[in-house]
From Swiss-Prot:
Transmembrane regions listed in the UniProt entry: 49-69, 77-97, 113-133
Amino acids binding Cu cation: 88, 92
Single Gene Ontology MF annotation: metal ion binding
Native source species: Oryza sativa subsp. indica (Rice)
Membrane topology listed for this record: Multi-pass membrane protein
Identification of the protein by name: Ethylene receptor 4
Length: 777
């Protein structure tokens, strides 16, 4: 190429010189011919510049691609080619400059050198092409191989993505089955088989489960086969028709492994799974855990249950037998099987929760029925208790009223022992009435009153009652009092008297006088903190025993003869008293009602007995506050109401008679009425004959009573000439005590009631209330 260029350049120069010679030789030059030659020269110069620019740009491009790729194998050939290109470009560039300076010697020398170097470089490039072209061909072959491999990888990647999508779809279907209500284990297994068949293009799929009642057999419960006539799959529930032994080696191998196992096509499990289908290709199997929720007994210990598994058998089509099961396919099977296990576990848990909910609902119904029966029994018991208390309260109220008249006779003719007996009877009756009021009105809350009372009088009356009970039971009685006991103390005398009577009654019930002599002892003395305690269960108190406090020890004991103790120790002998108790029943003192009372009174109580069973005792220690100053017990004032005309309405004959006697004792002229209606009829017929009306009506005690005291009072105020009548009504003990909101006072004002007297009606209480009413009105 350089030689051709040189020849062209020399020819152009010769032509240019001859033309000039012709023009300068004499004669006129052809201006048109000179213009064409000049145009050609300009065209050659431009072409040389463009060719030079093109040649010089090629090495730059090669350098750029060399930085982007590894050209170590063709480095020599590339260098030769780059040198050849650069020299060719330089030759064309110098040739372009010769058109302007054709006779420049340096330019001609440079052009000659460039052409010589270009010739050498072209020769070297031609030689290097002998090795460059085969390498280039090998690179092309490798590129085609890589392209084919990339195509196969792309195709495999598409298959993997499709299978992953199918796996995701299978997981979503199983999740939907889990969220379905209610989930079914067989439905979950069917969904698993269908989704795996769709994802992997299976020829057949089978689900084996342990046979019910046959632990050594597996039953084919589901079988999925591909029908050749259409694209749909046929899912059959086989049932118990096809079985396989649980001790088969393939079955044992699958059961023992957590991952999928590839089986031989001629194995027993594979042959049994391809029932009714064409011969299959590669076979894989995996176990699916079936959760059995532990059943808990009453103690909370779980029952140990043996693990149970189902087997999922997957069969590929025969034309895929060469490929077999890939690791990715087995991973897909593992993922779907794990999801199926989760779904089965969820279904088992939900099934167990439903059964537990049903059992809990049944138990709740039973508990509600039991609660209803218990509430009915409680209401019945309360009704019976209230009826019994109401039935007992009226006789007790009558006794209290009669005893109040005996305590305040018109002439003081009673002997001291008679007065002591009457006071003891009055205290016992008041205690019984108060206890019944507590049972009816305030059964839960216990309160202790702290007010001054005569300790000597209480002890004398308690000893009197204890001696009377001992003599009635045929036992002896002995009491011992300390002279240093204070006269007046502050406390709840009713609670103390109740505790003492209970101690006496408990020991007397344990005394069998027919088997031998018994003697009851009663002792009261002051004790101190350092006194020896008789019960290990009792924790000593640490009160401050100053001059304002005193600690009193009450001890009631029972002593028996040797023959009585021996007879009581025989196991075959039963006590003859129906109320007798055993030694274990002595503990009732420390429980419930009495224990609360003792604690509220800052005291302690315990029982003790000797090893031979001859003697038993109950000890009570109470702390009292001493009453400061001298207290004078003045007898209550009994007024005399001269000829006060009173109408008494009471629906109980005994109470009516006692209240009438009390009113007559107060100097009243009394007419009685057995009911509220009779009272109203008497008032309507003789309006001006009565000055005061006493109402003691209780419709709860008498079911036939039509009206209570408040209703009768309202009817009385509705009468024409009854505005001047004074009305006093007798109410139960707890009505006024529990009236915190003033509802009873408001009801009395609305009904026109002038006074209230608390039951039981006694001579001092009724006299004081009548005096107050007469003074206020």
């Amino acid at each position: 190429m350089a030689m051709v260029t040189a020849r062209q350049f020399l020819a152009s120069a010769a032509e240019l010189g001859s033309g000039r010679r012709r023009c300068g030789g004499g004669g006129a030059c052809d201006m048109r011919e000179d213009g064409g030659v000049e145009a050609l020269m300009q065209c050659q110069r431009v072409s040389n510049l463009l060719i030079a620019a093109s040649f010089l740009s090629i090495p730059l491009e090669l350098f750029y691609f060399a930085t982007c790729a590894d050209l170590s194998e063709v480095k020599c050939a590339v260098l030769h080619f780059c040198a050849f290109i650069v020299l060719c470009g330089a030759t064309h560039l110098l040739a372009a400059f010769t058109h302007a300076h054709p006779h420049s010697a340096p330019l001609l020398r440079a052009l000659t050198a460039a052409k010589v170097l270009a010739a050498v470089a072209s020769s070297a490039a031609a030689v290097s092409l002998l090795t460059f072209i085969p390498k280039l061909l090998r690179i092309k072959v490798r590129e085609s191989l890589l392209r084919d491999k990339a195509s196969r990888l792309h195709r495999d990647l598409g298959l993997v993505r499709r299978r992953e999508e199918a796996t995701s779809r299978a997981v979503r279907e199983l999740t939907g089955r889990i969220r379905a209500s209610p989930p079914d284990a067989h439905a979950i297994l069917r969904t698993t088989a269908l989704q795996l068949a769709d994802a992997l293009g299976l020829h057949a799929c089978a689900v084996w489960m342990p046979a019910a009642g046959r632990p050594h057999d597996l039953v084919l419960v589901h079988h999925l086969t591909s029908r050749p006539d259409d694209a749909a799959d046929l899912l059959l529930e086989v049932g118990d028709a096809c079985t396989v032994a649980a001790d088969d080696p393939d079955v044992v191998d699958v059961m023992a492994s957590k991952v999928a196992k590839v089986l031989e096509p001629d194995s027993a499990l594979a042959m049994a799974s391809s029932v009714g289908a064409a011969p299959a290709g590669a076979v894989a199997a995996i176990r699916i855990p079936i959760l059995r929720v532990s059943i808990y007994d009453g103690g909370g210990t779980p029952e140990v249950t043996e693990a149970s598994y189902a087997i999922l058998v997957l069969l590929l089509p025969p034309h895929d037998a060469a490929g077999g099961w890939s690791s990715h396919d087995l991973e897909i099977v593992q993922v779907v099987a794990d999801q199926a296990a989760v779904a089965l576990s969820h279904a088992a848990v939900l099934e167990e929760s439903r059964s537990m909910r049903d059992r809990f609902a049944e138990q709740h119904r039973a508990l509600m029925q039991a609660k209803h029966r218990a509430a009915m029994a409680t209401r019945a018991f309360s009704s019976i208790q209230s009826a019994m208390c109401h039935a007992m309260r009226r006789p007790v109220h009558s006794i209290v009223g009669l005893v109040s008249m005996l305590q305040h006779p018109e002439a003081d003719t009673m002997r001291p022992e008679q007065r002591l007996a009457v006071d003891a009877i009055a205290r016992t009756s008041n205690l019984l009435s108060a206890l019944m009021d507590e049972v009816i009105v305030n059964r839960q809350h216990l309160s202790v009153q702290r007010k001054p009372f005569s300790l000597h009088a209480l002890i004398k009356e308690a000893i009197s009652v204890a001696g009377c009970l001992s003599h009635c039971g045929g036992a002896g009685f002995l009491h011992q009092l300390e002279c240093a006991l204070p006269e007046w103390v502050v406390g709840d005398e009713r609670r103390v008297f109740h505790l003492l009577l209970d101690m006496v009654g408990t020991l007397l019930n344990r005394c069998n006088t027919e088997s031998g002599a018994c003697r009851l002892s009663f002792s009261i003395r002051i004790c101190n903190v350092g006194e020896e305690r008789y019960s290990l269960d009792w924790i000593p108190m640490r009160p401050t025993f100053s001059g304002c406090n005193v600690c009193v020890k009450f001890k009631v004991g029972i002593g028996r003869s040797r023959s009585c103790a021996i007879e009581r120790s025989l196991p075959c002998e039963l006590p003859r008293r129906s109320a007798a108790t055993t030694s274990s029943q002595m503990g009732h003192i420390f429980s419930g009602y009495f224990n609360k009372i003792v604690q509220m009174m800052n005291g302690n109580m315990w029982s003790a007995s000797d090893s031979e069973g001859v003697g038993e005792s109950v000890t009570l220690i109470l702390q009292f506050k001493l009453q400061q100053g001298h207290v004078e017990a003045s007898p209550p004032y009994i007024p005399h109401l001269n000829g006060l005309r009173v109408l008494l309405a009471d629906d109980d004959a005994m109470n009516r008679g006692v209240t009438k006697k009390i009113l007559e004792r107060l100097g009243c002229q009394v007419m009685s009425a057995p009911s509220g209606a009779h009272c109203l009829s008497l008032l309507a017929s003789a309006e001006a004959s009565f000055q005061l009306v006493v109402l003691d009506l209780d419709d709860r005690a008498v079911p036939s009573a039509a009206m209570d005291g408040f209703e009768v009072a309202l009817r009385i105020r509705e009468l024409r000439y009854s505005c001047w009548l004074l009305i006093v009504i007798a109410v139960a003990a707890g009505v006024v005590a529990t009236d915190d909101g003033g509802a009873v006072q408001e009801l009395c004002q609305r009904a026109g009631i002038n006074g209230l007297v608390q039951k039981p009606v006694t001579l001092p209480a009724l006299g004081a209330q009548l005096c107050r009413v007469l003074q206020d009105n």
